[in-house]
Amino acid sequence: MNLIFATHNSHKTDEIRKIVGDLCTVLNLHDIGCAEEIPETSDSLQGNALQKAQYVNDKYGLDCFADDTGLEIDALEGKPGVYSARYAGEHCSFQDNINKVLSEMEGIENRRAAFTTVIALLYDGEKYFFEGRIDGEITKKQSGTEGFGYDPIFKPNGYNQTFAALGEDEKNRISHRAIAMQKLLTFLKEKKIL
């Protein structure tokens, strides 16, 4: 079975493919010939995920899923949140976002943070949502080379390393995206879709 993942992000696609394993084939927007950038204009993770999935469903007539992820930092009143991917500006890099967070967190003792992923699934005319969350903290400096996004500065609770230093196998076992994806896979198995 093919699962259509409404994303152009190759890092996310690779991560999801590793989480899913051989249960099914995950195809992204590039794989289905969609080159358009899908706007994310909602003020919620759920809204952005649904917006992306709905776009693909409307334009291509395909059942699909999409996700949106936010890093919420207590000391920054929940920022960057829904704007995590473009926190340092519309066309910023992962490093630009990291630099902005580290700059804003300079001298702050409360470093509590959480990653949340919401997956929206459009299947057979119905909408379903799956959420994953992991609590942790923002480190004072970058550590590790694996992963992407804020992984070099996010240390999950119960671990002494950042996501980027844990290695992809461990991250893909415990991450917010893995938690949400496991919920989606469980749903698909229960519905006998997988």
Where are each of the predicted segments found?
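Anionic-ligand binding patches
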Residues: N2-I4, H11-L194
